[in-house]
């Protein structure tokens, strides 16, 4: 199906390209007339465009003129003129396509035209990048074009105060990372006042490196969590000790490919003996299974100095693909705590989910979505199925002159790396720059040691120098440069032969103390001379590198995805420059060992140690292994989306209701409806069966008093009905609802109408804030065990949808009940405000001091980061990653004095999903 869809999508490319070419021709026809405009006249075009949009003119019709204005502005401010293919790429973005443009085609400049055009409507444009550095760099550089045309540019960075973020979002065009945009959306839906909101809608997004963000990172949802109750540390340490006594294969199984573990019968018996329990799988022992599985994972699947390092008494994750220490990030679902127990360091607490969304569903919020990347065609079908956006391949400005050489495969790693070092030495000696891609930090450091022994000067991008990443990558095209990096490191930074003059110019301006925002006039005045000096310095070296053969990209291992391999190759041969690429592999590489072990083992048996192996078997083996991984990952993303779609429908209901309350809507009628439903349900439960003489009116009144202060007595109601036999459920409801209305009006008269409306909003927000995280917990717990339904011949997804809907209805009923109970029973203190009388004192909900943010890294692996949210503790703590206990915002009812005997908190029965105490543990599977 996917391959058929890909063919259909490719067929449509020609029609789209024809349309884009028409737009480019129209822009070209306007170029001379825009060149004749003065700076002031060119800037005035922006106001003219806005007036035409206000009069009803469409953006499509305005495109040629707006693009021509941006082209001329970029030429005057940056010294860069949009090529025709860049205009075509920009038009594709405006039309809501993903533009596939090869490395070096100037994608950053491409985004300026559609961003400007769409910003004219006044609804904001978001430009999404892969990291904070690129967001800030692009906002500063391209912001010069926008400011020249009279638009404001903002940038969202980690650690910014809400007031600063709100200001940045108010700009016409805002740069930032997918995680920052997504977390701001979630935080807005956790806000307690309108003043706390920072985003202003989701109009149009341009996603840079769109495949990385919407594909690679889409397996992991964004999660905001706060510490859960319970003491699990003892069990983490206990099981860290227990698993040391268990043996792989005998007591448990490990699947490295799927990164899963399973406990075998002998292992279960040993654990039961150690813990002194009869049956590990009894319901009361179920949480222990999660601790056991995580302890085995920590022992077998996570290695020190590869997946993480231990520094300063903390376990710090190392991103295997970028080589960076992910400061403050943590594995979720108890895995990080299990590793901490294994390493004998302090165990930080687990957390409870407070808000979550997948990247797929976040980006579906935008009215229009587009993106750019050098490698999208392989995922065209998934982009269409998931996001309903097509991929169009934009032709390069100049043909690609890079020579992609055939893979060289050795029997083992030692001979492979010996050949790699020889090849690097030869290239280095003739002055050809070399970019070496490795699969992990461990491998990059190993290769670095080999190069050092041979006296080859080189730079290494790893956990120890990630702060210099962009600078190192930008200069990786200089004569004789050797740069060793993990495959994904430095993505988004252009490698220019002879050095990156523009990058050097930005650095030079910073050295001169000039800021593009603060010193806009002086910055613009000095830029041309600084850029010219940097260009002259790199021009002669550029020619020398061209003669040496251009950039040589050497891959030391194939990535799981063909797309990542293509990205690595694509670093060479930009803008028609010469270049080469080659992969050196070994039969013991992870990809071959895990995903095509049969082919690898057969070749290992016959291959000589120091002679490279070639042939169709190798090529097909690699392709087969990559297809397996890509298929598995695509299935995971599809599965994540299916289940999140269920939760997304619920989230939309909650967030829409919450936003309405937050914006100050009058919810008096909604509260009245809540009261009717809660009381009617309470009455129906106790009068639905039997004759009136059999009804337990005393029990009913006890239940009613737990909801509101009833002023009627059972005898008064019976007398009003004309006797017990004539009593009906409808009559009871009429009397009780009338009484409740009177009592509520009395309360409103006591507090004042305005204060009552405010109290209604605050209480309902608070109850939603308490119940929604509880529901997320229950849904997560349901999802963990739902796969077992397949054993009973039932579709797990259908079961999840059915039970999830029932749980959502329970939660909504619980919200209604708790809101009504709190409004009737909450004791509200008054303050004297002079002769005018009393004012109601409403305490703000308690705020957590810290929250944990879980998000995918560049390859989609989930990691968590802890950040202070308390105004007095705003400083971001990700550098040391120390999480601090925090609780969710509390219900005003929970933090205020209530009349004794009139609270709903001591009711015997709670409607809806109840929150479990203690840390959540995965359900185990006996094998």
Curated annotation (Swiss-Prot):
Disulfide-bonded cysteines: none
EC number: 7.4.2.8
Biological process, per Gene Ontology: intracellular protein transmembrane transport; protein import; protein targeting; protein transport by the Sec complex
Catalytic activity reported: ATP + H2O + cellular proteinSide 1 = ADP + phosphate + cellular proteinSide 2
Molecular function per GO: ATP binding; protein-exporting ATPase activity
Region (Disordered): 853-927
Quaternary assembly: Monomer and homodimer. Part of the essential Sec protein translocation apparatus which comprises SecA, SecYEG and auxiliary proteins SecDF. Other proteins may also be involved.
Family affiliation: Belongs to the SecA family.
Name assigned to this protein: Protein translocase subunit SecA
Organism per entry: Kocuria rhizophila (strain ATCC 9341 / DSM 348 / NBRC 103217 / DC2201)
